[in-house]
Amino acid sequence: MQHLVLIGFMGSGKSSLAQELGLALKLEVLDTDMIISERVGLSVREIFEELGEDNFRMFEKNLIDELKTLKTPHVISTGGGIVMHDNLKGLGTTFYLKMDFETLIKRLNQKEREKRPLLNDLTQAKELFEKRQALYEKNASFIIDARGGLNNSLKQVLQFIA
């Protein structure tokens, strides 16, 4: 078994699904944003504000290469922009948690939106969402309809890997 890599826009449920998959499959769960945040000693928002998005993307790209060297399979929850890296290919089996923009925004309360620097301006966020759609689909081994909630997404992933 390869790594199971969850991709999708901010708020699509990657972190929650990763935890459930980890429990169901008895695999360790890794969260790329959390790993970067712990290593740098700043939240993702603080990294963007203090070090810039380019530095965050560099940390992300380097982490992908590092994760490729792990010998045992993991469930990996990724940041929404990870699909911008050409080295994502080969990390594992990727599952795109697909959801429309309006549903994503409804799922995130104000506090959650404040943690995500790229959601400050909803018009810009929607443009980013639309731009990334093709990248998510291009990088996906499988597309998960994430609108049906966590349990539904979990069932879909488990069916694909059965």
UniProtKB/Swiss-Prot annotation:
Known cofactor(s): Mg(2+)
SUPFAM superfamilies xrefs: P-loop containing nucleoside triphosphate hydrolases
Listed GO biological process terms: amino acid biosynthetic process; aromatic amino acid family biosynthetic process; chorismate biosynthetic process
Binding residues annotated for Mg(2+), in chain numbering: S15
Catalysis: reaction(s): shikimate + ATP = 3-phosphoshikimate + ADP + H(+)
Taxonomy of the source species: Bacteria, Pseudomonadati, Campylobacterota, Epsilonproteobacteria, Campylobacterales
Pathway(s) it belongs to: Metabolic intermediate biosynthesis; chorismate biosynthesis; chorismate from D-erythrose 4-phosphate and phosphoenolpyruvate: step 5/7
GO molecular function annotations of the record: ATP binding; magnesium ion binding; shikimate kinase activity
Family membership noted in the UniProt record: Belongs to the shikimate kinase family.
Subcellular location per the Swiss-Prot or TrEMBL entry: Cytoplasm
InterPro entries per the UniProt record, alphabetical: P-loop_NTPase, Shikimate/glucono_kinase, Shikimate_kinase/TSH1, Shikimate_kinase_CS
Cofactor note text: Binds 1 Mg(2+) ion per subunit.
Subunit structure: Monomer.
KW Amino-acid biosynthesis (keyword) present: yes
Main enzyme class: transferase
Name of this protein: Shikimate kinase
Residues where ATP binds: G11, S12, G13, K14, S15, S16, R116
Cited function: Catalyzes the specific phosphorylation of the 3-hydroxyl group of shikimic acid using ATP as a cosubstrate.
Main location: cytoplasm
Gene Ontology CC entries for this record: cytosol
